[in-house]
Amino acid sequence: MIKYENVGYNQNISLDTVDMPLYFYLELNNSCNLRCKFCSVSNKNNEYISIDMARYILDELKNNGIYDVYYTGGEPLLHPNFMEIVEYADKLGIRQTILTNGILLDKIQPVLNKIMCVCVSIHGTKEIHNKLTDSNCYDKVLSNIELTKKITNVKINYTVTSDNQNIKEMKDVLEFGNKKNIPISFSKYNNIGEGKKNKCYININSFVENLNILRNEGYNFSVNDCIAPCTIEEKYTYLTHGCGAGYLFGSIDYNGNLKICPSSKRIIGNNKVNSIKKIWNQTSLKNFRKMEWIPEYCKVCKNLARCRCGCKIELGEKLNEINDYIVKTEIEKIWNRIKKKNMKVNISVLRKEKKDYVSLSYPSRKYNVEAVKILEKINNEQRLEQFAEYKDFLVALYKDGVLKEVDYNVEKENRR
């Protein structure tokens, strides 16, 4: 086990800060009336949560002090008992938000006054929106937004992909929101679901650069998805925030399966078998929230508290691993660049301190014996690729400037 830590302040963080999440996503169904190319859901079917199961879940959420529910799917308004579910939740005093494509909003007018907020998806101008959703729904959605706005709060969510990433598209939606006094939020495309199948793409640096331009031009908006600061230029990190999956929020699907995020494929329990509280407090989730599993690459990052290791579900791997696609890609990119190179350890003095060592050169770091042994081997002209199992550690060293590329032939000549 490698130890590579900051000196002077403790960078350890824990997400185990509340007994139960603040809100839950309730996936009412897995069907949809659109075919968005970037959708995070794949393998859609016509399954729905039963009305009895929905009531049972809502009761349990209330009994655990969870009063905020976000209805999602698929398209949640396709649920045949949607209005009945809303009426029941309203009687429990639960605050309700709908995440919808907006096509069916005119059909649920009788219960809109019981909804706290309706988040509608719009993804650019009419041409781009219809292209990305494989439909001709743009005018209908705008009409329903006007209708809904008279009854309750409306928010527009814009998911950014390579097709609608240009600043003109983003500006057009912001102008529409300003004109109608509707808040706008931007989400980045995540490498999951239909988007992954369709090989959708987002240039994260262009995305934040556009957001920065828009902010400097005076536009107000929020950013929904977490963005890891290490993947973008430092001047844009003010636009970033971490992910709340697995501690601030959770998700239950139409089969009663609990997940840390509605976009996750990893099931952590089933509400038909165990209570939400029991599932939420299982050992594996507690260990996840302790964040002791984070790699050295993240442990020494100054933005760890802000970022919290990026997206928790995108790669769909184990709970206790980095699952942010862009972060993992960045690590691999750096590793492939340095693994075949000769490196030298740029540390002038290591001071022994109990069982560990402290470097007395910038940046000051604490190493355990195993880490120091690897540093010694690297200094003995061994290439990094021989230590591939410690990739995250070596990439962290390189980013910190502890590892420097060196030409040993030149060094030998200089020593003669």
Describe the residue ranges of each PLM region.
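Flexible mid-to-C-terminal extensions adjoining Fe-S/redox cofactors in radical SAM and related proteins
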Residues: 1-15, 263-372, 386-416
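Conserved alpha-helical substructure of the radical SAM core
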Residues: 1-110
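Cysteine-centered iron-sulfur cluster-binding motifs in ferredoxin-type domains/subunits
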Residues: 28-35, 246, 298, 302-305
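Short loop/turn motifs at secondary-structure junctions
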Residues: 35, 65-66, 114, 153, ...
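Short amphipathic alpha-helical segments and helix-helix/interface helices
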Residues: 58, 83-87, 108-112, 142-145, ...
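Alpha-helix C-caps/helix-loop-beta hinges
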Residues: 64, 151, 400-401
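Radical SAM enzyme [4Fe-4S]-AdoMet core and its adjacent flexible, acidic
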Residues: 92-95, 116-117, 121-274
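Short capping segments at the starts of secondary-structure elements
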Residues: 376-385
